[in-house]
From Swiss-Prot:
Membrane association type: Multi-pass membrane protein
Annotated localization: Membrane
Family named by the database record: Belongs to the G-protein coupled receptor T2R family.
Gene Ontology CC terms: membrane
Designated name of the protein: Taste receptor type 2 member 110
Extracellular side: 1-13, 82-89, 155-205, 277-283
Pfam families: TAS2R
Leader peptide range in chain numbering: none
Miscellaneous comment as given in the Swiss-Prot or TrEMBL entry: Several bitter taste receptors with distinct ligand specificities are expressed in a single taste receptor cell.
InterPro entries, per database record: TAS2R
Residues passing through the membrane, by range: 14-34, 61-81, 90-110, 134-154, 206-226, 256-276, 284-304
Ranges in coiled-coil conformation: none
Function according to Swiss-Prot or TrEMBL: Gustducin-coupled receptor implicated in the perception of bitter compounds in the oral cavity and the gastrointestinal tract. Signals through PLCB2 and the calcium-regulated cation channel TRPM5.
Organism from which the protein derives: Mus musculus
Length: 333
């Protein structure tokens, strides 16, 4: 299995970080969904960008709760680990949820690009005028990749779950998918989940590179659009900080943050693959888990800071909490 031993302190640190990430994920994504739904109810309408943003927040909110359920399931009901259908279901749900989380974020980036960028190209103008249909088409095409990703699960040679308790060891040799290696401790039990064929991570990384490439192209095209707009403003001797320039900059800031977090996430996946084949280090795989959860959670807070409505709502909530805290202090003994 593995030669490296993870200490109890490493597991404790990992658990604390994971717990903090999950709590932040629930609060952040729940906040985005709640604000947009309340605004939708109040105005009786919702913009296309808010529709994508709300769907993304709900997807990630469910993802966080799915991770919590998985952890509780593995720690409180360890006997379920020996059932291949349970682990298969977990792997499939993870793939589906991760797929929509990444592709909805990509759709949001493409939507901002088509709305903000300015090109005289006829194809770009055609797509710009039909931005809603473009986003819908991206979702539909991504479903093909999702189906292919799920079908690729049949390529597994062996998936094993070892449960160690004293001198007792159980092994499940069914071909069952799971995103990566996991380790959970429950009392004296240690569960090591590993895919000996090393097929999942390369295939999943390949499918994740597709939305990353789409987002990167949209980001680079937005930079080019800003450069052209800036040159045009210089020729016309107009102020450099007009509304279009600010919209470009704000979209670029959000896009850059998403790509940076995405790149770090993919980097950890690559490191995880290398650690499986070469290093054999479990600590790297623990950080792989942390980065996998931290990527969508961190991006959600980037979206809050980059959206005027969400940022103002968050500031209002913080102001109310600060006022309530002061009131409680004055009422105290």
């Amino acid at each position: 299995m593995f030669s490296q031993i993870i200490s109890t302190s490493d597991i404790f640190t990992f658990t604390i970080i994971l717990f903090v990430e999950l709590v932040i994920g629930i609060l952040g994504n729940g906040f985005i969904a709640l604000v947009n739904i309340m605004d939708w109810t109040k105005r009786r309408s919702i913009s296309s960008a808010d529709q994508i943003l709300t769907a993304l927040a709900i997807t990630r909110f469910l993802y966080v709760w799915f991770m919590i359920i998985c952890i509780l399931l593995f720690m409180l009901c360890p006997h379920l680990l020996t059932r291949s259908e349970i682990v298969t279901s977990i792997g499939i749900i993870w793939i589906v949820n991760n797929h929509f989380s990444v592709w909805l974020a990509t759709c949001l980036g493409v939507f901002y690009f088509l709305k903000i960028a300015n090109f005289s190209n006829s194809l770009f103008l055609y797509l710009k005028w039909r931005v809603k249909k473009v986003v819908l088409m991206i979702i539909q095409v991504s479903m093909i990749f999702l189906i292919l990703n799920l079908l690729s699960l049949s390529m597994y040679d062996q998936f094993s779950i070892d449960v160690y308790e004293g001198n007792t060891s159980y092994n499940l040799g069914d071909s069952t998918p799971f995103p990566t290696i996991s380790l959970f401790i429950n009392s004296s039990k240690v569960f090591v989940i590993t895919n000996s064929s090393h097929i999942f991570l390369p295939i999943n990384s390949l499918f994740m590179l597709i939305p990353f490439t789409v987002s990167l192209v949209a980001f680079l095209m937005l930079i080019f659009s800003l450069w052209k707009h800036h040159k045009k403003m210089q020729v016309n001797a107009k102020p450099p900080r007009d509304a279009s320039t600010m919209a470009h900059i704000k979209a670029l800031q959000t896009g850059f943050s998403f790509l940076l977090l995405y790149a770090v996430y993919l980097l950890f996946i690559v490191i995880g693959m290398l650690s499986l084949r070469l290093i054999g280090g479990k600590l790297i795989l623990l950080f792989d888990h942390i980065s996998g959860i931290g990527f969508p959670i961190s991006h959600s807070f980037v979206l809050i800071l980059g959206n005027n409505k969400l940022r103002q709502a968050s500031l209002s909530v913080l102001h109310c909490l600060r006022c309530r805290s002061k009131d409680m202090d004055t009422m105290g003994p």
